[in-house]
Amino acid sequence: MKRLLSLLTGVLVMTGLLMALIFPQSAYANVSDEKLGDRGEKVDLNNSSVRAFRQFPGMFPTIAGKIVVGGPYSSVSDASSVLDASQKSVFDKYKDNFTVTDQEIAVNEGFDRINDGQYR
């Protein structure tokens, strides 16, 4: 019985290793992972939550909320159309830290962009 158990365990381990070689990790990536990799260090105006703007003083939560709700955008400069004059000056200060990619439903579903459930 012990030999049978060790044989079955060995077969399962070998099968798992073989599957790891046949199906690389990239096959398991989802749309959200891909989108996060595309934008790198920049904040994606079409796919980021309001919380992503906390790193830019003066933008969180008011300006960030307007940008998130006002999308989608085709370019970074389009986002300034939803802001007033004083908010535009703050936005322009950090403009180089933003990017725009196609909007993905997996990232934008529901109200996750407004409140993504991250609390201290």
UniProtKB/Swiss-Prot annotation:
GO cellular component terms listed in the entry, alphabetical order: extrinsic component of membrane; photosystem II oxygen evolving complex; plasma membrane-derived thylakoid membrane
Disulfide bonds: none
Gene Ontology process terms (BP): photosynthesis; photosystem II stabilization
Subcellular localization, as worded in the UniProt entry: Cellular thylakoid membrane
InterPro entries, alphabetized: PSII_PsbU (IPR010527)
Signal peptide per UniProt: 1-29
UniProt keyword list: Electron transport, Membrane, Photosynthesis, Photosystem II, Signal, Thylakoid, Transport
Domain of life, per lineage: Bacteria
Membrane topology: Peripheral membrane protein
Keyword Cell inner membrane applies: no
Subunit composition and interactions: PSII is composed of 1 copy each of membrane proteins PsbA, PsbB, PsbC, PsbD, PsbE, PsbF, PsbH, PsbI, PsbJ, PsbK, PsbL, PsbM, PsbT, PsbX, PsbY, Psb30/Ycf12, peripheral proteins PsbO, CyanoQ (PsbQ), PsbU, PsbV and a large number of cofactors. It forms dimeric complexes.
Family affiliation: Belongs to the PsbU family.
Function field: One of the extrinsic, lumenal subunits of photosystem II (PSII). PSII is a light-driven water plastoquinone oxidoreductase, using light energy to abstract electrons from H(2)O, generating a proton gradient subsequently used for ATP formation. The extrinsic proteins stabilize the structure of photosystem II oxygen-evolving complex (OEC), the ion environment of oxygen evolution and protect the OEC against heat-induced inactivation.
Protein name: Photosystem II extrinsic protein U
Gene source species: Prochlorococcus marinus (strain MIT 9303)
Gene this chain is encoded by: psbU
